[in-house]
Each structure stands twice: as structure tokens, then as C-alpha cells.
Amino acid sequence: MQENYKILVVDDDMRLRALLERYLTEQGFQVRSVANAEQMDRLLTRESFHLMVLDLMLPGEDGLSICRRLRSQSNPMPIIMVTAKGEEVDRIVGLEIGADDYIPKPFNPRELLARIRAVLRRQANELPGAPSQEEAVIAFGKFKLNLGTREMFREDEPMPLTSGEFAVLKALVSHPREPLSRDKLMNLARGREYSAMERSIDVQISRLRRMVEEDPAHPRYIQTVWGLGYVFVPDGSKA
């Protein structure tokens, strides 16, 4: 799946950039790297990329600000945030503002490769158990989710989704009225096991509820089943 995929690495650590360029190129990706937001902006005016690996702690504009800015511009490029070990608050904030995944430093390049592949699979609409194209539009309340085109609408108004949000929502709507544990959701949406220390599923659920629920504190469509996980209820009735 690596053929023709272009990866942009944004990190001020020159040695890490060189290592990732070499390793990801060996894995079949086209890789460019820059050291800061200014260089990134100049490059993005000339080239497009399938995915960005973005360091949180950058000189000048930091990774959180870059991610927020790109999402405010409706840039759909998936972003994997690179954070320092122990920066849980920053990881959660990164996911809340639209990062698709994160990886803490120090990391094994193989782990980053696995996460890149998982995000690109989601972006390519390759989730297991997906409905066929003929069954690809899911309607609930005022919303329509097109699983084939990865678009969601509130009545006629488009609602942009990150690849992470789409993956979690797709997993839920593909299993209506079936409570899904965090483990199951993580496996369906990200292709890996859930860690008890990880908050990414909860963060994505919170973001989705803010999009589709009139009262996110009392959700109708994405409900919590205590002790079991989360459940999608198409008609908004009690699970």
C-alpha cells in the first residue's frame, strides 16, 4: 500500500528527520522533511501529501497550533502527532483539535510505520466489516454519513471529519445497537489493541458527540453502556 504515498515529516531534530526519511523511503514511501512551520507552509504551497508526522514541540509555532490551523482550513491530511513521553494532556488536546493519532518519543520507527499504515488504511476506506457501496449511506436524525465518500452532512451542510473521527464513527454505525468496548473500537478503527492508559477513543467519542448530539452530556445516538462500552442507536431511543 506504500506505493506513491507521500509523507511529510515536521520535526526540528535533524537526526530524527534524517532517520525517518531514510527508513520510510526504504519502506516504499516518498518522504519530505522540514524543521518548522514556516518551511512546512512553503512546501505545502507547492506539494500535497497523504500524511504528516508532526512534532508537538517545535520552535516558533508549535505542533498543536499547526494542527489547529490546518483543521480550521479544512485540510483533510491525516496527522500523527509526535509527543514527549508523559505529555498526556498535550496528546489529548492534539486529538481534540483533529490529530488522527499520536506516538510518544522515544519510539521505534517500526511502531511509527505501523501507525502510518493504519491511518492510511483508514483514509483509503479499508476498514473490516464495511457495508457495500449500495449500503454505504447511513441516516440518523438530521445526519447522513456516506461510508463510500467519507462525507457527513447535517441536512445539506457538510461536516468535515478527520480520518480518526470517521474511523470511529464508521465502526459504530457498522454495528448498530451492538455495544462496542474500547478494545473492540480500537481494533476496528485503528487496527491495534487498546491500552488502559490511552484516551484516544474517549476523545474521539467526545468530539463526535459534540457534532451529532443536541445535548452531548445526554447523548441519544452515541450512548454509553456502563461496563460494556459505546453503542450507536440510529433512532435515538434508549439503548
From Swiss-Prot:
Response regulatory domain boundaries: 6-120
Residues bearing PTM 4-aspartylphosphate: 55
GO molecular function: phosphorelay response regulator activity; transcription cis-regulatory region binding
Effect of residue 203 to M: In ompR2; OmpF+ constitutive, OmpC-
SMART domains linked: REC, Trans_reg_C
GO biological process, one term: phosphorelay signal transduction system
Regulation: In the presence of 0.2 M NaCl, 2.0 mM sodium cholate (bile salts) decreases expression from the ompC promoter; how this is mediated is unknown.
Superkingdom, natural source: Bacteria
UniProt-reported outcome of changing residue 226 to A/C: Loss of transcription activation, loss of DNA-binding, about 20% phosphorylation in vitro
Impact when changing residue 225 to C: Wild-type transcription activation, decreased DNA-binding, about 40% phosphorylation in vitro
Location of the protein in the cell: Cytoplasm
DNA-binding region per Swiss-Prot/TrEMBL record: 135-234
Pfam families to which the protein is assigned, alphabetical: Response_reg, Trans_reg_C
Classification via CDD domains: trans_reg_C
Family annotation (PANTHER family): DNA-BINDING DUAL TRANSCRIPTIONAL REGULATOR OMPR, REGULATOR OF RPOS
Oligomeric and partner information: Monomer in solution. Up to 8 OmpR molecules bind to the ompF promoter; each 20 base pair (bp) region of the promoter binds 2 molecules of OmpR, which may only interact upon DNA-binding. Binds to direct repeats in the 20 bp DNA fragments. At pH 7.1 protein is monomeric, as the pH decreases to 6.5 and 6.1 about 70% is dimeric, which is poorly phosphorylated. DNA-binding ability increases at acidic pH.
Name of this chain's protein: DNA-binding dual transcriptional regulator OmpR
The encoding gene: ompR
